[in-house]
A protein has these predicted regions:
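Short aromatic-enriched loop/helix-cap "lid" or pocket-rim segments at secondary-structure transitions
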Residues: 137-141, 177-183
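A short glycine-rich, Lys/Arg-flanked "PGG" loop and its adjoining helix->strand segment in the class I
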Residues: 109-124
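Feature marks short, surface-exposed loop/turn motifs that line or immediately flank catalytic pockets
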Residues: 133-135, 172-175
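Short, glycine-/aromatic-enriched active-site segment of Class I SAM-dependent methyltransferases
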Residues: 125-147, 151-156
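A short His-aromatic
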Residues: 100-104
Length: 234
C-alpha cells in the first residue's frame, strides 16, 4: 500500500501500523468528543480507525490525489485544504488529529493556531511527529519533511499554538527503530514506496507482530523514532 504526502507516496508497513495504534490509544485516553478533524489525512488509514471507533470524522488533505482516494475510501466529510487555512467555522470540532503532519509544514505554529481555531475550548488534540533533529536525513527529504522535533521544540510549538500539553511520549524503541534503520530505509533506497511484493507480505505480518512489543517501551527516549502528544485547546 501507499499513501500520499503532497506528491510523494509513503510505504505503509509495520512502523506505520504501530504508530497509528499508539496514537489512537493516546487520543482515546483524552476522552474526546464525537466530532473529529483529521487534518493531513493522507489516504485515510487513521480516518478509518477513528470511524471504526465510533467517531464522526472529517478528513482534510492538501493533495488532490489523496482527497480523491479519501472520498472513495472513508466515511464522513472530506475537504481539500492546507492545514494553515482550514475551511471550517470557529469551534467546529470536539477534537483533532495531526498524525505525521507538522514536520511537513513550514509554518507549524500557524498550523497549530488554525487547528486551535476550529476546536472548541477544551477540545482534544493528538499529534505524532518524527523525533531527533540530528537524525534528519535522506528519508526525511524524500518524504517532504522540513524538520524533525526535539521534545522541547514540539512542546513549545503546541503551547505557542494555543494548547496545554497533557502528555508527550517517545515511541519506537527498540524494534521499530531497528526496523526503520535496517529495513525501511534500505527498502526505500531500492524500491521507493512501491507496494509490498507478494513474497514480502508474510514477513511484514511477522514484523508487525514483533513491533507490538514496543508498546512496553513507550516513553523510552533512547533511539525513539517519534513523539506522541496529547493536548487540550486553551
Amino acid at each position: 500500500m501507499t499513501h500520499e504526502w503532497g506528491s510523494a507516496p509513503e510505504f505503509v508497513g509495520p512502523r506505520h501500523e504501530l504508530r497509528e495504534k499508539l496514537l489512537l490509544d493516546l487520543f482515546r485516553s483524552g476522552s474526546p468528543g464525537p466530532h473529529v478533524l483529521n487534518a493531513g489525512a493522507g489516504t485515510g488509514s487513521f480516518s478509518l480507525r477513528l470511524a471504526e471507533n465510533g467517531f464522526d470524522v472529517t478528513s482534510v488533505d492538501a493533495s488532490s490525489a489523496a482527497v480523491e482516494v479519501l472520498r472513495r475510501r472513508v466515511p464522513g466529510e472530506v475537504a481539500q485544504a492546507d492545514v494553515t487555512t482550514l475551511p471550517f467555522a470557529d469551534a467546529a470540532f470536539d477534537a483533532a488529529v495531526l498524525g505525521e503532519v507538522l514536520e511537513h509544514v513550514e509554518d507549524d505554529r500557524g498550523a497549530l493556531e488554525e487547528v486551535a481555531r476550529v476546536l472548541r475550548p477544551g477540545g482534544v488534540l493528538a499529534v505524532s511527529v518524527p523525533a531527533d533533529p540530528k537524525r534528519f536525513g535522506p528519508s526525511d527529504r524524500w518524504a517532504g519533511h522540513v524538520r524533525r522535533y526535539s521534545r522541547q521544540e514540539l512542546l513549545s510549538a503546541c503551547q505557542a499554538g494555543g494548547f496545554t500539553v497533557e502528555r508527550c511520549r517517545a515511541w519506537g524503541f527498540p524494534f521499530a527503530a531497528l526496523y526503520h534503520r535496517y529495513l525501511y530505509e534500505r527498502r526505500l533506497d531500492r524500491h521507493g514506496a512501491s507496494a509490498p511484493r507478494r513474497w514480502e507480505r508474510p514477513a511484514l505480518a511477522v514484523l508487525s507482530a514483533i513491533l507490538q512489543v514496543d508498546r512496553l517501551f513507550v516513553g523510552v527516549e533512547r533511539g525513539a523514532l517519534g513523539y506522541l502528544l496529547l493536548a487540550t485547546r486553551d
